[in-house]
Curated annotation (Swiss-Prot):
InterPro entries: aa-tRNA-synth_I_CS, aa-tRNA-synth_Ia, Anticodon_Ile_BEm, Ile-tRNA-ligase, Ile-tRNA-ligase_type1, Ile-tRNA_ligase, M/V/L/I-tRNA-synth_anticd-bd, Rossmann-like_a/b/a_fold. It is found in: Cytoplasm. This is Isoleucine--tRNA ligase. One of its GO terms (cellular component) is cytosol. Keywords: Aminoacyl-tRNA synthetase, ATP-binding, Cytoplasm, Ligase, Metal-binding, Nucleotide-binding, Protein biosynthesis, Zinc. ATP binds at residue 598. It holds the Pfam family Anticodon_1. PANTHER family: ISOLEUCINE--TRNA LIGASE, MITOCHONDRIAL (PTHR42765:SF1), SOLEUCYL-TRNA SYNTHETASE (PTHR42765). IleRS has two distinct active sites: one for aminoacylation and one for editing. The misactivated valine is translocated from the active site to the editing site, which sterically excludes the correctly activated isoleucine. The single editing site contains two valyl binding pockets, one specific for each substrate (Val-AMP or Val-tRNA(Ile)). Its EC number is 6.1.1.5. It comes from Streptococcus pneumoniae (strain Hungary19A-6). Binds 1 zinc ion per subunit.
Length: 930
């Protein structure tokens, strides 16, 4: 036997290298085979419910890192709730209708307008489901736990029926109406868009300053007067039917030198406009308030058949332009509102593809709307005063990335205005985890217009509306519920397979159809109505979930998207918000803080992370950032996170190895019998437990990460485990001192493994497989530990906080001695302490081997004053010299009792007593040489 064999060197097969990329899929299959998700739900039956409702990602393509961050965050929350006494099922979902899938099929050569619609929709459905399958595997590879066998998908018959019923209730309450308001119109998609489908980019446009000649000045202006107008959308002049001024804005009638004409502009803008138009020696002839100009009639710049009326509008400002805007009710929301109030014609001169129509005039007909500027300039002639190119923020179709226009077309709307206050009142009841999120959603609802819910596309849920022979729209409870039942049985494709009369209840009649003939609506619903109905299609209809949901967690862009549409439909139906809490996340940016895009080549695919690091590192990264704001991710950042993971893993490996001979049922030492330092570490760990439990409850992942890393680095590695080897390796295997420390080791190991499970389930299960004395076969079936409090806890914490200060001072003294070449390692030192009464009392209270805690070979607490050469602090001074004696071959301390023993071992008296007591046979035979 060799002397080193008398040491209790920790033994474990738990590998230092995790091998996550290859091991994770193996563990995940094991969990699936063991039906862990189902077993967890069974365990928690009857406990308080917690419903995190999954916002459905769009089923198209592989997931990106933003998807991963969001789904991992949800998984951490659901797992922590499941391990905290809640019944917390997770039903993942997918959004499957809409234009992107139509675009994919188009790129694949599918020609929608040349094939049977039902066959086309079948292709859309097949593609969508293939993407659901692809993304399901992507999410499962991240270690996300949920009911993957029974997700919700917005194209399933049961979901579509639930969506129809949401619409039906809104129709019954009078919230659905048809109108020809201007809507966001995407000529590139040939469809209306909702606000949530808009994104803004900078666009360079031609702006024109031109003049309308007064035709009837109403006794205020002469007919040789011209009202100066500014526009950034020249094509809309073809539909201009009025000029709008601000009632309380001051306007001036001016005549520049050398000009026969007189002009009206906003007084505040006269100086800048004079410079722009090249006017000199401008004479101000008169000043008017805007309201004095009301109902003056002007000529259209070129269309002699059209008169343009001067009207008042609150939207007019003097921030730019001339303080007067031309008004085309068919091409703008403000224009429409003031136009309708003043009985102006709602003219639309652009078709669904962005092509100018016949009513725009023969010079314009057939031109693309963006290309008409030269023609407009030619038609304006000498009425054009100036033109310039401007860059401004402009709305784009978020899918096609093309600019859009406002365009008045008959559409179906959900009236938000009818119950806006009810929605705002509900927002006040929701808990927002960021105050700015509440303000953002509140302001969006307060300021938004009615919701355009109709789309002129094919792949989506049909609007369950019929038309009588006289054109009357039919959307009554009887017909809508009948359609819902048909969809529930056959799916929404039945709408296109059957004639209108076969979609109506048997023997249905309507006074507007004396001949019994009906037509059906051909528009489909906005996809935001699809996902916005999920509270009904999923949360209400799934018995394991509770409505309203406890939490919605999505990206901050969903304040205008899913948070918004879900809120509107839920309040419209039931008068309550669909969620009790909202937690929003920022976007994942690259390592430089720039937006990720394929064109820049700075994207990171979750699959690449899994191959290089493992999903576990991506999960740990999610907790290492403040995801309420935009976050950064790169392979370098993930490499740093991987180092943190390695530190966590190897620390826990040390605990596993050094409790391998510890049976908690037999070897645990009662708390009251622990040393003071062990009690201190137990208390510090329980503080960590409380911090992490509280942070899980508040969804504060970064708090968990920081607290965990700090505990492992500072409390364990830099202190407790730093001197632990002197105990667990050196002392007798069954000695009280070793069992005391092992008791703390094991307690920390078991509980920290549970605390890590929601974040690092793969690693936690791997650790758990080495803990043979724990009852649960999977740590995921256990509960998070509760924080324990101890007697005299504050007193112990105060004592050891003071000792840590003392320890820091001692380490400075040792460092000085090391720099002066007095010692090499701290274990070579004899440290003499010159304490005052406070420190003396402290060292007595610590009641431990202080030399062991400081990792020095010898320590003397001296009486009397410190020598002049001592390193002095306010309460204590130190001197350092090399310890007397020789190095013990077993404990490596320098000790004056170190000597060669009769059994061929050069060891100190302390080690000799341990060896002679525990290894009598080896002592009798003598140890082998090193």
């Amino acid at each position: 036997m060799k002397l080193k064999d008398t040491l209790n060197l920790g033994k474990t097969e738990f590998p230092m290298r995790a091998g996550l990329p290859t091991k994770e899929p193996v563990w995940q299959k094991e969990w699936e085979d063991a039906k862990l998700y189902q077993r967890r739900q069974e365990l928690n039956q009857g406990k308080p419910h917690f419903t995190l409702h999954d916002g459905p990602p769009y089923a198209n393509g592989n997931i990106h890192v933003g998807h991963a961050m969001n789904k991992i965050s949800k998984d951490i929350i659901v797992r922590s709730k499941s391990m905290s006494g809640f019944y917390a099922p997770f039903i993942p979902g997918w959004d499957t209708h809409g234009l992107p899938i139509e675009q994919v099929l188009s790129k694949q050569g599918v020609k929608r307008k040349e094939m049977d619609l039902v066959e086309y929709l079948k292709l859309c459905r097949e593609y969508a489901l293939s993407q659901v399958d692809k993304q399901r595997e992507d999410f499962k590879r991240l270690g996300v736990s949920g009911d993957w066998e029974n997700p919700y998908v917005t194209l399933t018959p049961d979901y579509e029926a639930a969506q129809i019923r949401v619409f039906g209730e809104m129709a019954n309450k009078g919230y659905i109406y048809r109108g020809a308001k201007p809507v966001y119109w995407s000529w590139s998609s040939e469809s209306a868009l909702a606000e949530a489908e808009i994104e803004y980019h900078d666009l360079v446009s031609t702006s024109l300053y031109y003049a309308n000649k007064v035709k009837d000045g109403k006794g205020v202006l002469d007919t040789d007067t011209y009202i100066v107008v500014w526009t950034t959308t020249p094509f809309t002049i073809t539909a201009s039917r009025g000029l709008t001024v601000g009632a309380d804005i001051d306007y001036v009638l001016v005549q520049p030198a050398g000009e026969a004409r007189k002009f009206v502009v906003a007084a505040e803008l006269l100086t800048s406009l004079s410079e722009k138009f090249g006017w000199a020696d401008v004479q101000v002839l008169e000043t008017y308030r805007g309201q004095e100009l009301n109902h003056i009639v002007t000529e259209h710049p070129w269309d002699t058949a059209v008169e343009e009326l001067v009207i008042l509008g609150d939207h007019v400002t003097t921030d730019s332009g001339t303080g007067i805007v031309h008004t085309a009710p068919g091409f703008g929301e403000d224009d429409y509102n003031v136009g309708i109030a003043n009985n102006l014609e709602v003219a639309v001169t652009v078709d669904e593809r962005g092509i100018m129509m016949k009513n725009a005039g023969p010079e314009f007909e057939g031109q693309f709307y963006e290309k008409v500027v030269p023609t407009v300039i030619e038609k304006l002639g000498n009425l054009l005063l100036a033109q310039e190119e401007i860059s401004h923020s402009y709305p784009f179709d978020w899918r096609t990335k093309k600019p859009i226009i406002w365009r008045a077309v008959p559409q179906w709307f959900a009236s938000v205005s009818k119950f806006r206050q009810e929605i705002l009142d509900e927002i006040e009841k929701v808990k927002f985890h960021s105050e700015w999120g509440k303000v953002r959603l509140y302001n969006m609802i307060r300021d938004r217009g009615d919701w355009v819910i109709s789309r002129q596309r094919a792949w989506g849920v049909p609007l369950p509306i019929f038309y009588a022979e006289d054109g009357t729209a039919i959307m009554v409870a009887e017909t809508i519920e009948h359609v819902a039942q048909l969809f529930e049985e056959h799916g929404s494709s039945i709408w296109w397979e059957r004639d209108a009369k076969d979609l109506l209840p048997e023997e249905f009649t309507h006074p507007g159809s004396p001949n019994g003939e009906f037509k059906k609506e051909t528009d489909i619903m906005d996809v935001w109505f699809d996902s916005g109905s999920s509270w009904n299609g999923v949360v209400v209809n799934r018995p394991e979930l509770t409505y309203p949901a406890d939490l919605y967690l999505e990206g901050s862009d969903q304040y205008r998207g899913w948070f918004n549409s879900s809120l509107i439909t839920s309040v419209a139906n039931h008068g309550v918000a669909p969620y009790k809490q909202i937690l929003s996340q920022g976007f994942a940016l690259d390592g430089k803080g720039e937006k990720m895009s394929k064109s820049l080549g700075n994207t990171i695919a979750p699959s690449d992370v899994e191959k290089q690091f493992g999903a576990e590192i991506l999960r740990l990264w999610v907790t290492s950032v403040d995801s309420s704001n935009d976050v950064r991710i790169s392979m370098d950042i993930l490499s740093q996170v991987s180092e943190t993971y390695r530190k966590i893993r190897n620390t826990l490996r040390f605990l596993i190895a050094n409790t391998s001979d510890f049976n908690p049922a037999q070897d645990t030492v009662a708390y009251d019998e622990l040393r003071s330092v062990d009690k201190y570490m137990t208390i510090r760990f329980n503080q960590l437990v409380k911090t992490i439990r509280d942070a899980y409850a508040d969804f504060e992942f970064l708090t968990i990460y920081k607290a965990l890393v700090n505990f492992i680095n500072v409390d364990l590695s830099a202190f407790y485990l730093d001197f632990a080897k002197d105990v667990v390796y050196i002392e007798g295997a069954k000695s009280l001192e070793r069992r005391q420390m092992q008791t703390v080791f094991y307690d920390i190991l078991v509980k920290i493994t549970k605390l890590l499970t929601p974040i690092l389930p793969h690693t936690a299960e791997e650790i758990w497989s080495y803990l043979e004395f724990e009852a649960e076969d999977f740590v995921q079936l256990s509960e998070l530990p509760e924080a324990q409090t101890s007697a005299n806890q504050e007193e112990i914490l105060d004592t050891w906080a003071a000792f840590m200060d003392f320890r820091g001072q001692a380490q400075k003294a040792l460092e000085e001695a090391r720099n002066a070449k007095v010692i090499g390692k701290s274990l070579e030192a004899h440290l003499t302490v010159y304490p005052n009464e406070v420190v003396k009392t402290l060292l007595e209270a610590v009641n431990s081997n202080v030399a062991q805690l400081l990792i020095v070979s010898d320590l003397t607490i001296a009486e009397g004053p410190a020598p002049e050469a001592a390193l002095s602090f306010e309460d204590v001074a130190f001197t350092v010299e090399r310890a007397a004696g020789e190095v013990c071959d077993r404990c490596r301390r320098i000790d004056p009792t170190t000597a060669e023993r009769s059994y061929q071992a050069v060891i100190c008296d302390h080690c000799a007593s341990i060896v002679e007591e525990n290894f009598a046979e080896a002592v009798a035979e003598g140890f082998e040489e090193k």
